[in-house]
From Swiss-Prot:
An annotated Gene Ontology molecular function: aminomethyltransferase activity
Protein name according to UniProt: Aminomethyltransferase
Organism listed in the record: Clostridium botulinum (strain 657 / Type Ba4)
Matches recorded under HAMAP family: GcvT
One biological process term in Gene Ontology: glycine decarboxylation via glycine cleavage system
A Pfam family reported for this protein in Swiss-Prot or TrEMBL: GCV_T_C
Record-linked InterPro entries: GCS_T, GCS_T_bac, GCST_C, GCV_T_N, GcvT/YgfZ/DmdA, GcvT/YgfZ_C, TrmE/GcvT_dom1
UniProt lineage: Bacteria, Bacillati, Bacillota, Clostridia, Eubacteriales
Gene Ontology cellular component list: cytosol; glycine cleavage complex
Disulfide bond positions: none
Keyword set, alphabetical order: Aminotransferase, Transferase
Amino acid sequence: MEGLKVTPLRGVYEEYGGKIVDFAGYELPTQFKGFLHEHHTVREKAGLFDVSHMGEATVKGKDAQKFVQYLMTNDINVLKDNEVLYTFMCNEDGGVIDDLLVYKFAEDEFFLVINASNKDKDVKWILDHKGDFDVEIVDVSDSIAQLAFQGPLAEEILQKIVDVDLQEIKFFKLKRDVLVNGKKCLVSRTGYTGEDGFEIYCKPEDAKGLWHAILNAGKEEGAQPIGLGARDTLRFEASLLLYGNEMDETITPLEVGMGFFVKLKVEEDFIGKDALIKQKAEGVTRKLVGFELLDKGIPRHGYEVIKDGKVIGHVTTGYKSPTLNKAIGLALVEEQYSKIGTEFNIKVRKKELKAVAIDKRFYTKKTKTK
């Protein structure tokens, strides 16, 4: 695939039967043994993902914490060293520039993990807003590879090849300099699947060895490599949002039900705070809802949502859920039609199919929160 970037793991995909696609300008595997098989593997056992296409940046310096707080909607000040926080980075109108993870190493050192499709945009945004803050910002994406190992057996398997007790790494916590198969890595108990699991950051030259070591460690338990197809169905079932689908620069966190990650009472200003305060006071005019298709069909991103002949919104993500075996979706609709139990239609291939609004938390599984 000419002109596309590759990750340090590009050479291993075919060994495992990977089918390669263009994703965010990278050659990445959409599936290995089939996305349904891979989806169930992560729900029931453990699966390994190459997520080295994600972006990473460091923010260091005397004003690092103040600067990161200025960029983010969540309360960075509550973070302790070696903790991770999910947050939004918004524009002045409250629209989402990106959703990302903030890793705190120390008060003067933070590590940001950003979406692959937004890497260049995010780094430019961060640099453009540096102002007089005493910080150094470095895009370190090309010097880091990232693997995600997710599923109920992930801890048990990974424990075989690490030098620390993984139970000490609690949910949304991190540990640096963990030896994974003898290689120094940053390991956090985070993920994008709705299952327990870990994200592992390593040197690019160590990625292939770690990939093979993790899969070999989990051979008896049935660990498998997982492609982008299952990654999307897994995150969707867990109602984890995808940039470009559920959010973009014209959609605010409040509209998609993510107000918990917007701390309007923090003393410090952050970009978009005034707009979000105003929106909260006035009330949102549209909301993200879950829905189940009652007629036979599969909803897809961009399909119209219709009520009494009027377009009231659009589908942001839709699938036949592998876990629930139902055609379900997320849709951004006018606020008055967002109540659970509201009936509307989804336009699927020129036909209007019946649907009903349901709780968008389609699937929940306990992760290790303590």
